[in-house]
């Protein structure tokens, strides 16, 4: 039996300010830093030992991964970064205050953009200050792969190749895996792992803390699912 641990990044400065973040590269808040440290302590207390770690290319997830592994006494664990684990791209909503967006577009419309499985928010302009098209970390990526907006369906579609090529093979090889990522990229993978319907996944929330653990059998069927610390 293997363990797959998902840790959503700790609270970010934009989480704190109630802003849509998506692919914008925002740092952890002081609270978020402590959440990442505490995640590592919970991992250590649980006696979980990792063989591999995966994270996104966004600072808040990378820092959470590093702090969690460090405080679990496992900073040495090989870690791979991929844009495919990035947060869902919120398009033109990126950087907007969620309450102000609701005032501008209406509560119902913003709720649909945030919570529906397959409705896209307005696209981000390629010359937007937060556009990934001019971000050096994506310089080697085919521009056609860089999104201007995503829903959960599209997020799952771009995360799945990474699951199938990297994460699942490691688990099938008997390795314990840590994934430090984002609320929606984790939700997308949880939908796949649990076989949830499009409607069922909409009620699933991934908190910034504590980490979510899946114990899986040799065919990656779920044996046990729980949050560390009993929360």
Curated annotation (Swiss-Prot):
Q: Which Gene3D superfamilies match?
A: Phosphoglycerate mutase-like
**This protein's record includes keyword Ribonucleoprotein:** no
The protein's name is 2,3-bisphosphoglycerate-dependent phosphoglycerate mutase
Q: Where is this site: Transition state stabilizer?
A: 182
Role noted for this protein: Catalyzes the interconversion of 2-phosphoglycerate and 3-phosphoglycerate.
Q: Which family does it belong to?
A: Belongs to the phosphoglycerate mutase family. BPG-dependent PGAM subfamily.
Give the E.C. number(s): 5.4.2.11
């Amino acid at each position: 039996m293997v363990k797959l641990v998902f840790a959503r990044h700790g609270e970010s400065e934009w989480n704190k300010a109630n802003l849509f973040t998506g692919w914008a590269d925002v740092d952890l808040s002081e609270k978020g830093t402590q959440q990442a440290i505490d995640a590592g302590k919970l991992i250590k207390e649980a006696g979980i030992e990792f063989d591999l770690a995966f994270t996104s290319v966004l600072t808040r997830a990378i820092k959470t991964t590093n702090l969690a592994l460090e405080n679990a006494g496992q900073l040495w664990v090989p870690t791979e970064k991929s844009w495919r684990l990035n947060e869902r791209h919120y398009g033109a909503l990126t950087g907007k205050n969620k309450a102000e967006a609701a005032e501008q577009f209406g509560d119902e419309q913003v709720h649909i953009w945030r919570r529906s499985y397959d409705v896209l928010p307005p696209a981000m302009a390629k010359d937007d200050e937060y556009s990934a098209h001019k971000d050096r970390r994506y310089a080697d990526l085919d521009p056609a792969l860089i999104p201007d907006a995503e829903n959960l369906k599209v997020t799952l579609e771009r995360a799945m190749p990474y699951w199938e090529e990297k994460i699942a093979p490691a688990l099938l090889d008997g390795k314990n895996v840590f994934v430090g990522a984002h609320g929606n990229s984790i939700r997308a993978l949880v939908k796949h792992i649990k076989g949830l319907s499009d409607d069922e996944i909409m009620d699933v929330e991934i908190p910034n803390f504590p980490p979510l653990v899946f114990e899986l059998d040799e065919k990656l069927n779920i044996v046990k699912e729980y949050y560390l610390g009993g929360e």
